[in-house]
């Protein structure tokens, strides 16, 4: 790692030259989600004073979105703290008395029904019949046994055979089907039910991975994702409380809301020794202003453009303001990178990083909350799971647009009713979730009601009094829910995505110009809130280490 206090030819080091003039490195963080806030807070706590966070939307939190309706908080985004042992999100929430335990540390059968440890999942068929409890338990034991086998390919280096196509879904479907068909104790009718249940479980798995289909998730890389031991927890007051606690260590003027970025111009000093390729429109200190978010323009060493000492990075905002910086930490989602990497970076990203962006996957998992006047489900029921009997032999989890509702795997009962009222939370993912997002509330409520009537066999279920749903796929600032290792990708691609720019170290090139964080950049904890937070702290630590000598010397 190149140090800002390097000896020898440090006079020619663009980073050292800039620091002699400015005194403090300027860091711009793009995104005020968990990763961006964690990075900014860590830098500020270690003595960095010229830090700016640019958030495209009107609020902080990123993919944490707690919506308050009356006295109740609903989570459109992150919902659970997954595991407690060493989980920094858990530690922050626990220290502030925010937690409520929802499951024990074991992998639950429904695995997405984490609102309550109590009750049972009701597996219902499209003919309006409930699958017997013993059949559900037998199938769940078999499925979980095969699921554990999917972990062994990465963890034990087992070779993947060609028949599986290196796909979690293909492997699981085939293994479970063969075991069901070969079972001499089951009747043909029971076998048909269990075969149909495979697709329902794989829909749940697809929602959990936020893939269009679990068939697209890499079998050889699947076991690298690591589950933190301990119980799952929810935060009754809203997951946004964690975001707010994280932001408490950041002065308000550091965060600029409604500030989308158009382009990051990096490697400016080496490419243009006399100045940037675009003209600055914003002068003034972007951190040490009046404390009210304005620009004082009183400190030319920190805030004004200096063509004799060009900045390594220039952030061009959509409102045409241009912010020069020594370092930029990019926390945008993988979905945004996939959509915008060609225009978001100048010069273009290295081929290796572009390839990693292409290979890694991100999809959409959406929630549909339905509120009813009275419950039509029993007090022992914690979820309603939909099993289509005509999918017993199906080999796909893709449906035509007019059948998008078939991707809804089921509805969880929000618990306790004293807090939530009588509310169901449905799950849908993939391209079908995008179709759902394009429908209006009335249409979605109507279709969900018809499904509930069909699967429960109760034609008298009323329409919900209220509907609330997420739309992560069509949101231009996210373009998806969270990442996964797609077939053809591996943890090595996560490392490539996280690698700072520029790749080469030179006395002529400022180091660590563009850094990358966010859940998709954490090799073990991608897709999680703790992975996002840890990735932000990781990138901050790179800069803290780089400037260690500077801050140890003091003023």
From Swiss-Prot:
Basic and acidic residues compositional bias, start-end: 274-291
Localization in the cell: Cytoplasm
Cofactor: FAD
InterPro entries in the cross-refs: Amino_oxidase (IPR002937), FAD/NAD-bd_sf (IPR036188), Flavin_monoamine_oxidase (IPR050281)
GO CC annotations, alphabetized: cytosol; nuclear membrane; nucleoplasm
Region described as Disordered: 271-307
Cofactor binding, per record: Binds 1 FAD per subunit.
Root EC class: oxidoreductase
Disulfide bridge positions per record: none
UniProt note on tissues of expression: Widely expressed. Isoform 1 and isoform 2 are expressed at higher level in brain and skeletal muscle. Isoform 7 is found in brain and spleen, isoform 10 is widely expressed but found at lower level in heart, kidney, liver and lung.
Induction comment: By antitumor polyamine analogs.
Segments passing through the bilayer: none
Pfam families: Amino_oxidase
Keyword terms: Cytoplasm, FAD, Flavoprotein, Nucleus, Oxidoreductase
Binding annotation for FAD: 35, 55, 63, 79-80, 261, 519, 528-529
Effect of residue 320 to R: No change in enzymatic activity
Annotated EC: 1.5.3.16
Top-rank lineage group of the source organism: Eukaryota
GO biological process: spermine catabolic process
Recorded GO MF terms: polyamine oxidase activity; spermine oxidase activity
Catalytic reaction annotation: spermine + O2 + H2O = 3-aminopropanal + spermidine + H2O2
Pathways involved: Amine and polyamine degradation; spermine degradation
PANTHER family: FLAVIN MONOAMINE OXIDASE (PTHR10742), SPERMINE OXIDASE (PTHR10742:SF416)
Job description of the protein: Flavoenzyme which catalyzes the oxidation of spermine to spermidine. Can also use N(1)-acetylspermine and spermidine as substrates, with different affinity depending on the isoform (isozyme) and on the experimental conditions. Plays an important role in the regulation of polyamine intracellular concentration and has the potential to act as a determinant of cellular sensitivity to the antitumor polyamine analogs. May contribute to beta-alanine production via aldehyde dehydrogenase conversion of 3-amino-propanal.
UniProt family annotation: Belongs to the flavin monoamine oxidase family.
Name of the protein described by the UniProt record: Spermine oxidase
Organism: Mus musculus (Mouse)
Gene from which the chain derives: Smox
